[in-house]
Amino acid sequence: EGESVQLNFTNPSPESHTIHLHGLDVDQANDGVPATSFFVVTGGEATYEFEANHPGTFLYHCHVTTTLHLTMGMYGMILVNRPDMTLFEGGPGYSENAPLLFSDLAIETNLSAVQSFPFHDIRPDVFMVNGVSGDQLEQAEHIIDFEPGEPIALRLGSMAYSLLHLNFPEELNAICYMSDGRPVPEPFAVSDLEIFPGERFTVMIEPEAGWDGHIGCEFWNIPDQQLEEEQFVHVRDASLSVPDWGATSAPVGFPNPTNSEITWLGPASLRVFDAAGNSVFCGPLNEGRLEVSDWANGFYTAVFPDGTHTRFAVIH
């Protein structure tokens, strides 16, 4: 809070881009809306400047061909903190931030990047918290470990097309203090919280000692009003954490999603299971490549000889 901020942006991509500072109090020239400020064209450079006068949870994203560039991952979160570790002047103190950025991905838009996709046509296939989902949220770096008696500020923001519905177990003692970068008139205890696209909240938790559980994060399709998927954010007493001394990272396949073949650098063989758990491939790779042009659309799990695994999608 109170600092002067400069964001230096270089655009090496073949498309024009901007950085829209979503929710921050900036002047029009630095707001990143191309019709009222400027584009950063291919090979171009620009600097965005603003004063961080208000503490809170904010977002940023590209505002060029917004539907496509959002689902391609051009977004993030900005936190403005007070030096004294209080949420706002006269507000409660906390021990640390725990940012939770919700987003989703429509695979079709990444496979057809030159097509037009109006907002109402976007139907996400992948639903994420801080860019990961499913079992990945159980990795140590994505678990929120707490020390009893030390409040944690959950910084919640949605860049998803979905409506988020969060479920806070009562053992978290969750209280909402801020909405869209400003203190709420009266803080309130929260067990369920809806977050619409672009919204931000700051929720303080002070879990009970010894607690080990999850915050449920439901992703609802807004046009169809259907529950698409639920992710779970793990919260646990730090004394219950166990160092994972032998953890190794699985090789990353590319492109992912794919419609013809996927390549891994390193492993010579693997086994692949479909979403129903059926083994669909087991054997050596051809120079790291796996041919999938005749495979059915869906999600697959690749298991490597060292026991690590990763998921990939086939979309035709």
Region annotations inferred by a language model:
Residues N53-G56, P207-W211, V292-N297:
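Surface-exposed, short loops/turns at beta-strand junctions within beta-sandwich domains
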Residues E1-V80, L163-L193, G213-E229:
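Histidine- and aromatic-enriched segments that form or immediately flank copper-ligand environments
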Residues Y94-P148, G157:
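Acidic-aromatic/histidine active-site loop/patch
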Residues L240-L265, F273-N278, N297-F299, A313-H316:
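Surface-exposed, proline-anchored Ser/Thr-rich loop/turn motifs
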Residues N278-F281, L285-T308, A313-H316:
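Short, surface-exposed loop/turn motifs with a glycine/proline- and acidic-biased composition
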Residues L70-I107, E186-S249:
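Extended terminal and domain-junction accessory segments
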Residues G44-Y48, H142, S191, E199-V203, ...:
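Short strand-edge motifs at loop-to-beta-strand transitions and within beta-strands
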Residues G2-S4, P148-P151, F254-T263:
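Short coil/turn motif common to extracellular beta-sandwich-like domains
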